[in-house]
Amino acid sequence: MPLPTSQLRLAMVAGEPSGDLLGASLLGGLRERLPESAQYYGIGGQRMIAQGFDSHWQMDKLTVRGYVEALGQIPEILRIRGELKRQLLAERPDAFIGVDAPDFNFNVEQAARDAGIPSIHFVCPSIWAWRGGRIKKIAKSVDHMLCLFPFEPAILDKAGVASTYVGHPLADEIPLEPDTHGARIALGLPADGPVIAVLPGSRRSEIALIGPTFFAAMALMQQREPGVRFVMPAATPALRALLQPLVDAHPKLALTITDGRSQVAMTAADAILVKSGTVTLEAALLKKPMVISYKVPWLTGQIMRRQGYLPYVGLPNILAGRFVVPELLQHFATPEALADATLTQLRDDANRRTLTEIFTEMHLSLRQNTAAKAAEAVVRVLEQRKGRA
């Protein structure tokens, strides 16, 4: 059924930079499929705004870093959410799309759905890894979920939640064969000799907890692997300043710190030591052997352990359904253990070939033209609503 010729209005909310990137990608796909007169508004960042999005509030008002900071921001976040819900109920857009940020968006989505406004959520929370009870909230709040990973629709289907697998945008963005030589030239690194990328995280708390351990591991690796060089991306000047005392404490390290360009840094590497997170998927798509690690405060770790379901935390292992790369977490993440595991990943050529095969298959599975698939799913929801009207 064709969509109405009257002006379409879609409300959207992205709460952090990664959501802004996904939202902009979705908007690009929607603009190719919906009438030019369609309007898009809500909360988004600069990438969404560049796609013609009208952001009524600043996205960084929703971006929280750490529990202490979050407590201070709660009143402002609740105020914005209340105003947004009142606006939605008054203006009744054709659909509401929440981009990630589930703690903020599910509440808005439930209000929209209860009012007869279709609610769509982009990025399924990791209910398959921990806090599985959130599936009940999803079932109450979401009409249609756009999933990044292929195993998620089956989980949602059991709870009666309609969904579409749209693939992961990183798989569309990253080439199937990484240009390691070109990345080394771009960073001024030698063409020959081993290079290890080290990524200790992007938050102050992450650097404080695992940064010293990663630097101690680098010092051990340099002793055991003569000629090895390290590259470490710093996403912001503030992060670089946070790393500087650790750099000063290890003046003999053959370390290059880059301003951002984390993907280039990983592409240049032969192996990667990385803090758990989405960046581990990026490393897999770049076909790199890696060691995954993290350290969190003891109480946080206990909560995560009790609410978790899988024996692994890294996305490459989760997607493979087994351990394909080592994980050293919490008290197991000692400098000695990290150095041993990373050097093994660096030196084992047979393992490198096996991982390349595994990660290539993973890459092809996730490469779905996410912007187009997500936009097509949204259009179908709009058509279904029109059919019921």
From Swiss-Prot:
The keyword Cytoplasm does not apply. GO terms for cellular component: membrane. One of its GO terms (molecular function) is phospholipid binding. It is an enzyme of class 2 (transferase). Its EC number is 2.4.1.182. Transmembrane segments: none annotated. Pathway: Bacterial outer membrane biogenesis; LPS lipid A biosynthesis. Keywords: Glycosyltransferase, Lipid A biosynthesis, Lipid biosynthesis, Lipid metabolism, Transferase. GO terms for biological process: lipid A biosynthetic process. InterPro entries: Glyco_trans_19 (IPR003835). It catalyses: a lipid X + a UDP-2-N,3-O-bis[(3R)-3-hydroxyacyl]-alpha-D-glucosamine = a lipid A disaccharide + UDP + H(+). It holds the Pfam family LpxB. Belongs to the LpxB family. PANTHER family: LIPID-A-DISACCHARIDE SYNTHASE (PTHR30372), LIPID-A-DISACCHARIDE SYNTHASE, MITOCHONDRIAL-RELATED (PTHR30372:SF4). Condensation of UDP-2,3-diacylglucosamine and 2,3-diacylglucosamine-1-phosphate to form lipid A disaccharide, a precursor of lipid A, a phosphorylated glycolipid that anchors the lipopolysaccharide to the outer membrane of the cell. HAMAP family: LpxB. This is Lipid-A-disaccharide synthase. It comes from Burkholderia lata (strain ATCC 17760 / DSM 23089 / LMG 22485 / NCIMB 9086 / R18194 / 383).
